[in-house]
Amino acid sequence: RGGRIVPRFNFITLLACVFSSMAIANDCVSYKMTPKITISVPTWTKEVVQPLDEMDLWHGNVIATMVDNYDIVADITSIEDGFCVGIKQVDAEIGYSNFLVQVDIRHKPNTCSYDAVLAHEDQHIREYLSVIDDFQVGLHNALYSAADSVMPIFVYNSSDIDMAIEEINNKIQSHPEMVIIKQKIKADEEIRNKRIDKNDNGDMLKKCFI
C-alpha cells in the first residue's frame, strides 16, 4: 500500500504546476488590447490563354485566384516568468489577385468571336470584384469579432513568440464569423456568375458567324 503514496504525490505536484501555469496565463488577460483592423484588396491582373485542347466553342472559362492573408501586429509584454503575446493590429489582404481567362483555340485573337468570348468572361471578372467590394463591411466586422475574441497567449521563452502569433492567426481564421462570411462570399459569387450565364443568350457571339 505504501507504494501508492508516490503517484499521489506526483499527481498533487502536477496539479500544482497546472494551476501555476493557469495563474500565469490569466495574468496575460489584463494586457488584452482592442485590435485595430485594416483590410485591403490586392492589385489584380488578367491573363488570357488558349489551351491546346479544344474547349466549348461558345463559352470561355475564368479561374480566379483568391488572396486571403493576415498579418498580425503583436503586442508583446514581458512579465516575471515569460511573455504575454496579444493582438495590437490585424492587417488583412482579401480579394482576387489574378484572373486566368481560357478561350477556345478555334477563336483567333483579335477576331469578332474571340472578343465576344472575352467580353462575356470580363463580366464574370467584374462580378468577382464587386462581390469583394460589397462584403467589405461584413469582412471588417467579422475580422474584428474574430480578433477581439482571442486572448493574449503566455509563453515562457522569446523563441516561442512566433509560434504564439501563428496560433493567434489560426484562431482568427477558424473563428465562426470568418468561416461564415467566406461561405457567404462564395455563395454570392456562384449566384452572380449563374445569373450572367443565364442572361446571356449568345447573340453577340452568334453574330460573328453570320
Give each language-model segment a name.
Residues D122-L139:
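Catalytic Zn2+-binding segment of zinc metalloproteases
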Residues S20-S21:
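N-terminal signal peptide c-region/cleavage motif recognized by signal peptidases
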Residues R1-V6:
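Short, Lys/Arg-enriched N-terminal segments with co-localized hydrophobic residues
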Residues V29-I94, N98-I105, A146-I210:
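Metalloprotease/metallohydrolase-associated module, dominated by Zn2+-dependent proteases
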Residues P7-L14:
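Sec-dependent signal peptide recognition
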Residues N110-Q123:
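Short alpha-helix carrying the canonical HExxH Zn2+-binding catalytic motif
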